[in-house]
């Protein structure tokens, strides 16, 4: 890890994250707050944005953050377009073996395909060990289609949006204006984001605030180890 350390903060169950960031220095525009989802972001922003005439920090979900830091000059395929490209990539013998007659037969299969290779990539996994017998045929078909799909993408300069989360597409220019990045109740950090945080620590202050007991989160490996539930009074 980098010489600079992540600052970890923990709050109790029932407490508000926004109440932890009430100081003037918490509300400067050089702060970037990142959230796991829109619900958490909306609650936080509603409480923090008191003075509409002053400059504010930036508030983004992790999905919005990803769209700004992973940049490629390739043609990015989203939603139905990436599934259509997948369909065109399926070798004829595979279509026959799987009884694929139309685009609509493979929508779920295609989404699983993109999700599988995304997980492999963001967690830096080269190969899956201990595959069950019933899984072997699926991985066989995935590998066959992947070979064909890669050729199509190379020919037309395509990339599915699922696969943009790659360190080779990571761009720091947009982040230059921020001095501090705060991850608000973000509890999952795939390998690629550990690398990105390590890179950002060279120039920025990084803070992670979680609604957990101190000791429940592995601060070295950035993952939950256990969950300590709050004590409740026995009913009378």
Locate predicted features:
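Walker A/P-loop
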Residues: 2-21
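Basic/charged alpha-beta structural segments of nucleotide/phosphate-handling enzymes
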Residues: 38-176, 191
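Short acidic, Gly/Ser-rich segments with clustered Asp/Glu that frequently serve as metal-coordination loops
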Residues: 185-192
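Conserved RecA-like helicase ATPase core segment
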Residues: 192-236
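Short glycine-/polar-rich loops that comprise or flank the Walker A/P-loop
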Residues: 29-31, 54-57, 204-206
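Structural recognition of the conserved hydrophobic beta-strand(s) that form the central parallel beta-sheet
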Residues: 33-35, 182, 206-211
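Conserved RecA-like ASCE P-loop NTPase motor core of nucleic-acid helicases/translocases
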Residues: 28-41
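Flexible, charged surface loops at secondary-structure boundaries
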Residues: 1-3, 22-30, 171-181, 200-203
